[in-house]
Amino acid sequence: MSQALRIVFAGTPEFAAEHLKALLDTPHRIVAVYTQPDRPAGRGQKLMPSAVKNLALEHGLPVMQPQSLRNAEAQAELAALRADLMVVVAYGLILPQAVLDIPRLGCINSHASLLPRWRGAAPIQRAVEAGDAESGVTVMQMEAGLDTGPMLLKVSTPISAADTGGSLHDRLAALGPKAVIEAIAGLAAGTLHGEIQDDALATYAHKLNKDEARLDWSRPAVELERQVRAFTPWPVCHTSLADAPLKVLGASLGQGSGAPGTILEASRDGLLVACGEGALRLTRLQLPGGKPLAFADLYNSRREQFAAGQVLGQ
């Protein structure tokens, strides 16, 4: 490594924590960690620290949790750290140009897509949902636009027919830190230069919400199968049967036709449901108050509940 840098790290979820963990194993000095304020979580709505905050405190690092970085006081606090570089990973706050200009080498971001495809908040899930053949991590030099900065480094990985949002997340969380460390070395040595993104190729990965996780049986089965995988483990696709909510955590393409949402067949292989085009076989479900189960287990004990002819989602 050419030189050890003073680095400010900014990130919030587990994906970001994996990057911080890797940086802590380098000679670089993490002079402060920025993360989102503690948020209410769980049934008790108790204030919970982020994954990044927990890791930072374990290592005795100073933790900053500003509500915003747009005010002069927060910017002066950042400037006082005399950072060479700011590494930003899924932080969740907009960084104004005044902040981007503070570190000597600027700010870099590890983004979980092959930019310019899937700029925005949910690139991992949108890639699976869209049926993309590959995904990856892009390390970019940040600018004021959303994920629009010059690309410093890209690493890619195929998306398999079995990948879920969770499995792809974990793979990218392993690839991203290595790419960031390589990019930092190139920046420090002055050998790495950004490639301008082609805005004409840009797509936007809208933030996930629970409302869109409701399965629309009028859609083609191939799209619903990808949606189930993309939204596992969160927000988890769901439907209803006889007014009872039903979470769908696993599905495969099946054969059959009928009115959308109609149960065509129940067997140990799964619950076959007619879609707008084709049919979807539900293979892993969660009933109210229960845990996720393979449909074969539900079929053994509740087969009468899943009789053919019933309509899901009504």
UniProtKB/Swiss-Prot annotation:
What keywords appear on the UniProt entry? Protein biosynthesis, Transferase
EC identifiers of the protein? 2.1.2.9
- Give residues annotated as binding (6S)-5,6,7,8-tetrahydrofolate: 113-116
| Residue ranges that the Swiss-Prot or TrEMBL entry lists as coiled coil | none
Q: Could you tell me what reaction this enzyme catalyses?
A: L-methionyl-tRNA(fMet) + (6R)-10-formyltetrahydrofolate = N-formyl-L-methionyl-tRNA(fMet) + (6S)-5,6,7,8-tetrahydrofolate + H(+)
MF GO annotations:
methionyl-tRNA formyltransferase activity
Q: Where are the transmembrane segments?
A: none
List GO terms (cellular component aspect). Answer: cytosol
CDD domains per UniProt: FMT_core_Met-tRNA-FMT_N (cd08646), Met_tRNA_FMT_C (cd08704)
Matching Pfam families, A to Z?
Formyl_trans_C (PF02911), Formyl_trans_N (PF00551)
Top enzyme class of this protein?
A: transferase
PANTHER family named in the record: METHIONYL-TRNA FORMYLTRANSFERASE, METHIONYL-TRNA FORMYLTRANSFERASE, MITOCHONDRIAL
Function comment? Attaches a formyl group to the free amino group of methionyl-tRNA(fMet). The formyl group appears to play a dual role in the initiator identity of N-formylmethionyl-tRNA by promoting its recognition by IF2 and preventing the misappropriation of this tRNA by the elongation apparatus.
Q: Which family does it belong to?
A: Belongs to the Fmt family.
Q: What is this protein called?
A: Methionyl-tRNA formyltransferase
Q: Which organism is it from?
A: Pseudomonas aeruginosa (strain LESB58)
